[in-house]
Design a protein with these regions (language model features):
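N-terminal targeting signals for export/organelle localization
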Residues: 1-52, 173, 180
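C-type cytochrome heme c attachment motif
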Residues: 77-84, 146-147
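Sec-exported extracytoplasmic/periplasmic mature domains
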Residues: 63-67, 84, 91-98, 119-126, ...
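Structural microenvironment flanking redox-active thiols in thiol-disulfide oxidoreductases
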Residues: 83-121, 131-138
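A short beta-strand-turn-helix
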Residues: 46-70
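Thiol/disulfide oxidoreductase modules built on the thioredoxin-like
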Residues: 117-124, 131-179
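Hydrophobic beta-strand anchors of alpha/beta hydrolase catalytic cores
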Residues: 71-72, 102, 148
Length: 180
């Protein structure tokens, strides 16, 4: 009987996420997000959600964010390089929550797998559903997984990186270079 209770406690701890004190594995907390300007705060309110609307809704969101730099990350739950770099985006979105807008684009994926992925890697910004790469075409990101696009504060597409980031320092360098 004691073994059964021990097994139940272990399973409960895993399901509740207990035991991980690694700050890199935790989503942004409210204190990090508090004080963001209204257009970026609107993204935070939709954090970790999958949004419909296609390229029209995505382009409207970009227009709403004019005046702020924007980082767009195209990903898919089945993409190993996307999984490898996603913690970098989690971390940078939290660190830059008041100055840089982040948006995800979930391409060529199904909703259940995407939601499972976001449950594993929660982010303080939404992702637009893009089953046919129409949203990715807005930022010329149809070819590679992952792809990251950088918009400057004027709303101009400044740079598109095809392929994944090997380390967070490279992402930081691109954010500082292009998302201004």
């Amino acid at each position: 009987m004691l073994r059964a209770w021990a097994a139940i406690l272990v399973v409960a701890s895993v399901l509740l996420g207990c035991g991980s004190d690694d700050p890199e594995s935790r989503p942004a907390d409210a204190a990090q997000l508090k004080g963001a300007p209204p257009p970026i705060a609107a993204l935070h309110r939709q954090g970790n959600e999958l949004l419909d609307g296609g390229p029209e809704a995505f382009e409207q969101r970009l227009r709403e964010l004019k005046g702020y730099p924007v980082v767009v990350n195209k990903w898919a739950s089945w993409c190993p390089p996307c999984r490898a770099e996603f913690p970098y985006f989690q971390n940078q979105a939290a660190k830059r929550a008041k100055k840089v807008a982040f948006i995800g684009v979930d391409s060529n994926d199904n909703d259940d797998d995407a939601r499972e992925f976001l449950a594993e890697y929660p982010v303080p910004y939404p992702s637009y559903k893009d089953p046919s790469l129409e949203v990715a075409a807005v930022f010329k990101g149809q070819l590679a997984f992952p792809t990251t696009a950088f918009y400057d504060s004027k709303g101009e597409l400044a740079y598109v990186k095809q392929g994944g980031y090997r380390d967070e320092a490279d992402l930081v360098a691109d954010i500082e270079r292009y998302a201004r």
